[in-house]
Amino acid sequence: MTTTYALAVIVGSVRAGRFGPVVAGWFVGQAKQRDDVTVDVIDLADTPIPSADFASRIGAADAFIIVTPEYNHGYPGPLKTAIDSLGPQWRAKPVGFVSYGGLSGGLRAVEQLRAVFAELHAVTIRETVSFHGAHERFDEHGVPRDPEAANTAAGVLLDQLAWWAHALRHARAAHPYGT
């Protein structure tokens, strides 16, 4: 039995001056401290969409973390394009969210993404890591100013994601998921 799972961390903003790489960098650091996961960072600013490479990387993943800002009460257009460029690669796999933004911390974007992933037959994880006022929540080195709370939230999300990744990988192997 394989005890590790493949996690794709998708950085959803492509804007100049974006904060996503800071948030994603911290989260990837948390994930890499674990021995139950391998991490592939897919930064949409550096990834052509659509592409065979993107499809292959999403297809190879057992689980996903979407790192998303909230722009105008929603998630970024390039993230929607990336998600919609594929279909079967998302099915019967868990998706977690790390969001950031102003007062809402990106949670409105996350709630919209939950509906999109439900339509793609993916399973979204209830727990979310969220940073309101994100620019003030990290120091100049990309470390959360309240590391205990942030690291605890990341740990809970990663624990739940691992459970679902293993359960759904086993289910997909035993009973291939239909359309």
Where are these regions (language model features)?
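N-terminal beta1-alpha1-beta2 submodule of the flavodoxin-like/Rossmannoid cofactor-binding fold
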Residues: M1-T81, S85-L86, P144-G155, D159-A162, ...
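Short, glycine-/small-residue-rich phosphate/pyrophosphate-handling segment
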Residues: G29, R91, V95-E140, E148-A153
